[in-house]
Amino acid sequence: LSSQVTQELTALMDETMKELKAYKSELEEQLSPVAEETRARLSKELQAAQARLGADMEDVRSRLAQYRSEVQAMLGQSTDELRARLASHLRKLRKRLLRDVDDLQKR
């Protein structure tokens, strides 16, 4: 009886393993196209994201160049205005100094 049970158990295990291998093969066949489709879709999405990122980075680069130009122009104007005011003050100081020197010489 024990030998018969062992044989039946072995046969059942072998049959179950064969069914499991067949199911595995069937599942792999079914999933292979799905996996390939998923890989292709992900690849497309990554390429699109990379293109968008590249475009966004180029936009940022362009905007930064524009802002830099604007800041340089503003700084240039500020520098020119400061230079003009300083020149005006220096002229006034020179006139005052010359007047004071003239007054001192007259004394």
From Swiss-Prot:
<feature type="region of interest" description="5 X 22 AA approximate tandem repeats">
    <location>
        <begin position="11"/>
        <end position="107"/>
    </location>
</feature>
<keyword id="KW-0558">Oxidation</keyword>
<dbReference type="InterPro" id="IPR000074">
    <property type="entry name" value="ApoA_E"/>
</dbReference>
<dbReference type="GO" id="GO:0034382">
    <property type="term" value="P:chylomicron remnant clearance"/>
</dbReference>
<feature type="repeat" description="1">
    <location>
        <begin position="11"/>
        <end position="32"/>
    </location>
</feature>
<keyword id="KW-0597">Phosphoprotein</keyword>
<dbReference type="GO" id="GO:0042158">
    <property type="term" value="P:lipoprotein biosynthetic process"/>
</dbReference>
<feature type="region of interest" description="LDL and other lipoprotein receptors binding">
    <location>
        <begin position="89"/>
        <end position="99"/>
    </location>
</feature>
<dbReference type="GO" id="GO:0070062">
    <property type="term" value="C:extracellular exosome"/>
</dbReference>
<dbReference type="GO" id="GO:0032438">
    <property type="term" value="P:melanosome organization"/>
</dbReference>
<dbReference type="GO" id="GO:0033700">
    <property type="term" value="P:phospholipid efflux"/>
</dbReference>
<dbReference type="GO" id="GO:0034363">
    <property type="term" value="C:intermediate-density lipoprotein particle"/>
</dbReference>
<dbReference type="GO" id="GO:1905907">
    <property type="term" value="P:negative regulation of amyloid fibril formation"/>
</dbReference>
<dbReference type="GO" id="GO:0043395">
    <property type="term" value="F:heparan sulfate proteoglycan binding"/>
</dbReference>
<feature type="repeat" description="4">
    <location>
        <begin position="77"/>
        <end position="98"/>
    </location>
</feature>
<feature type="repeat" description="5">
    <location>
        <begin position="99"/>
        <end position="107"/>
    </location>
</feature>
<dbReference type="GO" id="GO:0120020">
    <property type="term" value="F:cholesterol transfer activity"/>
</dbReference>
<feature type="repeat" description="3">
    <location>
        <begin position="55"/>
        <end position="76"/>
    </location>
</feature>
<dbReference type="GO" id="GO:0034361">
    <property type="term" value="C:very-low-density lipoprotein particle"/>
</dbReference>
<dbReference type="GO" id="GO:0055090">
    <property type="term" value="P:acylglycerol homeostasis"/>
</dbReference>
<dbReference type="GO" id="GO:0050750">
    <property type="term" value="F:low-density lipoprotein particle receptor binding"/>
</dbReference>
<dbReference type="GO" id="GO:0031012">
    <property type="term" value="C:extracellular matrix"/>
</dbReference>
<comment type="function">
    <text>APOE is an apolipoprotein, a protein associating with lipid particles, that mainly functions in lipoprotein-mediated lipid transport between organs via the plasma and interstitial fluids. APOE is a core component of plasma lipoproteins and is involved in their production, conversion and clearance. Apolipoproteins are amphipathic molecules that interact both with lipids of the lipoprotein particle core and the aqueous environment of the plasma.</text>
</comment>
<dbReference type="InterPro" id="IPR050163">
    <property type="entry name" value="Apolipoprotein_A1/A4/E"/>
</dbReference>
<dbReference type="GO" id="GO:0005543">
    <property type="term" value="F:phospholipid binding"/>
</dbReference>
<dbReference type="GO" id="GO:0071830">
    <property type="term" value="P:triglyceride-rich lipoprotein particle clearance"/>
</dbReference>
<keyword id="KW-0162">Chylomicron</keyword>
<comment type="similarity">
    <text>Belongs to the apolipoprotein A1/A4/E family.</text>
</comment>
<keyword id="KW-0964">Secreted</keyword>
<keyword id="KW-0850">VLDL</keyword>
<comment type="subunit">
    <text>Homotetramer. May interact with ABCA1; functionally associated with ABCA1 in the biogenesis of HDLs. May interact with APP/A4 amyloid-beta peptide; the interaction is extremely stable in vitro but its physiological significance is unclear. May interact with MAPT. May interact with MAP2. In the cerebrospinal fluid, interacts with secreted SORL1. Interacts with PMEL; this allows the loading of PMEL luminal fragment on ILVs to induce fibril nucleation.</text>
</comment>
<dbReference type="GO" id="GO:0034447">
    <property type="term" value="P:very-low-density lipoprotein particle clearance"/>
</dbReference>
<dbReference type="GO" id="GO:0034364">
    <property type="term" value="C:high-density lipoprotein particle"/>
</dbReference>
<keyword id="KW-0813">Transport</keyword>
<keyword id="KW-0677">Repeat</keyword>
<keyword id="KW-0272">Extracellular matrix</keyword>
<keyword id="KW-0358">Heparin-binding</keyword>
<dbReference type="GO" id="GO:0034380">
    <property type="term" value="P:high-density lipoprotein particle assembly"/>
</dbReference>
<dbReference type="GO" id="GO:0034362">
    <property type="term" value="C:low-density lipoprotein particle"/>
</dbReference>
<keyword id="KW-0967">Endosome</keyword>
<feature type="modified residue" description="Methionine sulfoxide">
    <location>
        <position position="74"/>
    </location>
</feature>
<keyword id="KW-0445">Lipid transport</keyword>
